[in-house]
Amino acid sequence: MEDSYKDRTSLMKGAKDIAKEVKKQTVKKVNQAVDRAQDEYTQRSYSRFQDEDDDDDYYPPGETYSGEANDDEGSSEATEGHDEEDEIYEGEYQGIPSTNQGKDSIVSVGQPKGDEYKDRRELESERRADEEELAQQYELIIQECGHGRFQWALFFVLGMALMADGVEVFVVGFVLPSAETDLCIPNSGSGWLGSIVYLGMMVGAFFWGGLADKVGRKQSLLICMSVNGFFAFLSSFVQGYGFFLLCRLLSGFGIGGAIPTVFSYFAEVLAREKRGEHLSWLCMFWMIGGIYASAMAWAIIPHYGWSFSMGSAYQFHSWRVFVIVCALPCVSSVVALTFMPESPRFLLEVGKHDEAWMILKLIHDTNMRARGQPEKVFTVNKIKTPKQIDELIEIESDTGTWYRRCFVRIRTELYGIWLTFMRCFNYPVRENTIKLTIVWFTLSFGYYGLSVWFPDVIKHLQSDEYALLTRNVQKDKYANFSINFTMENQVHTGMEYDNGRFLGVKFKSVTFKDSVFKSCTFDDVTSVNTYFKNCTFIDTLFENTDFEPYKFIDSEFQNCSFLHNKTGCQITFDDDYSAYWIYFVNFLGTLAVLPGNIVSALLMDRIGRLTMLGGSMVLSGISCFFLWFGTSESMMIGMLCLYNGLTISAWNSLDVVTVELYPTDRRATGFGFLNALCKAAAVLGNLIFGSLVSITKAIPILLASTVLVCGGLVGLRLPDTRTQVLM
C-alpha cells in the first residue's frame, strides 16, 4: 500500500513538473518581446530566465529532468543564438512570433477571443494601441542606431530627387521662348505649356503619394522618378508641339510624387531631435535645383552654335540640349536609389517585421562602423508590429484574361488610395488636415502668384523703357532704294515706298501704318514682332520671306506675288539681352533663398515649427507693401530676393509639420494631397496675378499680403510637433 502511494505521488509530481515547464516556456516565449523592449537599453542579460527557472524547478530525489536530451533535433535557423541552457545572446534576432500562436488551442473560459470573433471597430482600436506602442519603441530604436553615414547617404540620394523637382518647375519657363519659335507654338497655345506641367504635377502628387503608402516609399519614388526621367529625356527629341506637351505632362506627372515621398522617406529614419533640422537641410536641394536650371539655361540656350539639323524636317536646337541636361539629376537619383533600402517604419506598419529588423540593423551597423565602433551590437530583437486589418481581396490568377486582371488590379489599387485619402479626414487628423489645407493653399497662392507677377512687372518696365527709344518716321517718301541692314524698334506712319528693294533685311519690332508700297521687292526677309497695319501693296513681290497672313492687318494687295515663303518656324535673331536678363533674375531670386534655408535649418528645433511658419508668412505678407516703391528693374529684383528669402522658412517649416502630423499609414497620401492642392493654387495664382500686371499694383499687393497673413495666423493654430514622436 505504501509503495503504491509512493508511485502515485511520484507520478503526480512528474506530471506537475512537465505541466509547469510547458507553462513557463510558453509564457517566456510570448512575453520575450515585451521584456526585450523594456530591458534592451539597460543592457541586462536574458540569462535571468534560466536562473529564475532553476529556482522553481522541482525534481524528485534521485531523478533528474532529461527533456533537453533531444534539443538539437528541434534546432532551426529561427533558434540560432541559443545555447544548451536556452540562454539568449544579447542582440541576437529571434524571429517574429507566429500570428497563429495559440489560436488553435482549446479556448477556455475568460480567454481573449480571436480576431475572427472581433468586429472592425475593436480591431482598429487594437491597431491604434499597437501603433502608439510601436511609435515609442521605434523612436528608441532609431536613437540607438544613431545619426551617421547611412542618413547622410540617403540625404544626398533623396536630395537629387528633390533637386529634379526644382529643375522641373524652372525648365518650362526657360525653354518656352525658344520652344515657341521652334515648335511653331501659336500665341493662343503658349500658355498651355506652363499650365500642363503643373497639371501633371498636381495629379502625380496625389497618385504617387497614395501609392507610397501602399507599396512603399522606395518603390513609389523609383517608379515616379523613372517616369519623369524617361519623358523629360524624350521631350527633347520630339518635333511636334502636341507630342512635346504630352511628354511634359507625363514628365510632370512623374516628378509630382517626389516631394511627398522624399520627405516621408527621410523623416522615418531620423530621430526626434534631428528631424526638424535635417529635413530643413534637405529642402535646400530644391533651391539647388533652381540654381542649376538657371545656370544651365544661361550657359546653353543662347548658344545657337550648339544646334544641328538633319535636313529641313528635324531641327535640334540648343534649348533641347538644355532639356537633356536638366534630366540628369533625375537619372542620378534613380541610379543611386536602387542601392538604398526601403523605409523600415513603413515595413513595420505593413507587418513585415523581419525585413524591417534587417534594415534597422543595417543602419545601426553602418553608422557604428563609420564611428569606429564596429564591435557595438544591435540589441533589438523584437519590434512591435501593428495588427493587420485586411481591406482588399487578392485577385486570383484565373480571374478572366490578363488585361482584365490588370484592369481590376489597377482599379483596386486606386480604390485603396482613395480610401487612404478619405482617412485623412477621419479622427484624429481631420482638424489638422483642414488647417493644413488652408495654410498650403494660401502660401502657394501668394508665393507662386507673386513669383509670376515679379518677372512680368520687370518685363513690363523693360517694354516701357524700350518704347521710349522707339524711332518714329512719318509722312516721308523713298524711291529707287535698296535696304540690306537690320531695322529695329521703329514705327513708319504714312510712308510711300516706290521701286524699293528689301534684301536680306531683318525686321525687329517694326510697325508700318497707313503706308504704300509700289513696285517693291522683299527678298530673303525675316521678321520678329513686325506688322503691316492698314497698308497698300501694288505690284509687289514677296520671295523667301516669313511674312505670315497675321502680320498683315487690314492691308490691301493689288497684283502682288508670294514666292517660296519660308516654311517652319524661324529662330529669333534677338541679341539675347532679354534671355540673359531672365536667367540672371531667376538665378538671383533662387540664390536669395540660401540665407533663409540656413536660418530655418538652424532654428527649426530651437524656436519651433509653428513660430517659424506663422512668423515667416506674416513677415512675407508685410514685405509685399514694399512693392509700392518698386519703380525700376533693380528695385523690383531686390524686392524679389527679399520676398523669396522670407517665404522659404515658411515652406521648410510647413514641410516638416506636414510630415510629423500624419501617421505612417497615411503620411505620404496626406502630403501628396496637400502638394496637389499647392499646384492647383499655383495655377490659380498665375492666372489671377498675371492678368493684373498692366492694370494696377494695388490689387496684387493687397491680395498677396492678405492671403499670406491669414494663412500664417491659421498655421499658428496647428499642434506643436517639436517634441512628438513619429506616429
From Swiss-Prot:
NCBIfam families according to UniProt: synapt_SV2
Chain segments annotated as transmembrane: 155-175, 192-212, 227-247, 249-269, 281-301, 321-341, 438-458, 579-599, 610-630, 637-657, 671-693, 698-716
InterPro entries found in the cross-reference section: LD_SV2, MFS, MFS_dom, MFS_sugar_transport-like, MFS_trans_sf, Sugar_transporter_CS, SV2
(Microbial infection) C.botulinum neurotoxin type A-binding as annotated region, ranges: 529-566
Subunit structure: Interacts with SYT1 in a calcium-dependent manner.
Location of region: Disordered: 22-120
Positions glycosylated per UniProt: 480, 484, 534, 559, 565
Tissue specificity: Expressed at high levels in very few brain areas including the striatum, midbrain and hindbrain, and in the olfactory bulb. Expressed at lower levels in cerebrum, hippocampus and cerebellum (at protein level). Mainly expressed in brain; also detected in lung, liver, kidney.
Name of the protein described by the UniProt record: Synaptic vesicle glycoprotein 2C
Region of interest (Interaction with SYT1), residue spans: 1-57
Residues with the Phosphothreonine modification: 79
Positions of post-translational Phosphotyrosine modification: 466
Family stated for the protein in its record: Belongs to the major facilitator superfamily.
Subcellular location: Cytoplasmic vesicle, Secretory vesicle, Synaptic vesicle membrane
Topology versus the membrane: Multi-pass membrane protein
PTM info: N-glycosylated.
GO cellular component: dopaminergic synapse; synaptic vesicle; synaptic vesicle membrane
Extracellular side: 176-191, 248, 302-320, 459-578, 631-636, 694-697
Cytoplasmic side: 1-154, 213-226, 270-280, 342-437, 600-609, 658-670, 717-727
Biological process, per Gene Ontology: chemical synaptic transmission; neurotransmitter transport; regulation of synaptic vesicle exocytosis
